[in-house]
Amino acid sequence: MKKNKIEHYSDKEALDFHTNDKSGKIEIVSSKPMTTKRDLALAYSPGVAAPVKAIADNPELAYEYTTKGNLVAVISNGSAILGLGNLGAIASKPVMEGKAVLFKRFADIDSIDLEIDSEDTKEIINSIKSIAKSFGGINLEDIAAPNCFIIEDELKKILDIPVFHDDQHGTAIITTAALINAVDI
């Protein structure tokens, strides 16, 4: 059985990768053509009035008329960055952008990274609660224990969208897959 070779990269290569062409790893692009004045008017004003009124009458229509159903917030405070520790919210941004890229590449799910500059559990919960209606799901990432468990549990109680705690659930999924594969051997 051939083992996969782990490739190593220099810090310079990694930094160059993050700055070539455009800084960072994600961008927002229109899902509709924006080539005419009519397109622009439909995309913004006055064209947004019809979906705005429809969603005001029935908030579930946000899943039909907006990106909400295919949009995940990847959220961290940078207090437990894998292999690096507590380096803070903004330092976690490359990791969260990387997670957003993985969502897009492997599941065609759009995601936005959000870094919350706080280690106060209640403040983090309230911050996420205040923006959650814009998203179809929340992915918590690199938040130190035990706060990560408290935050996840509380968000699951108060939000009506899925909350995925990547460090906990992702590890459980990988461990289960490894055990299943070990049984097959």
Locate the predicted segments by residue.
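Short internal alpha-helix immediately C-terminal to a glycine-rich phosphate-binding loop
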Residues: A172-I185
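Active-site nucleophile and cofactor-binding loops and adjacent substrate-binding regions
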Residues: F164-I173
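N-terminal ligand-binding/catalytic initiation module
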Residues: M1-I161
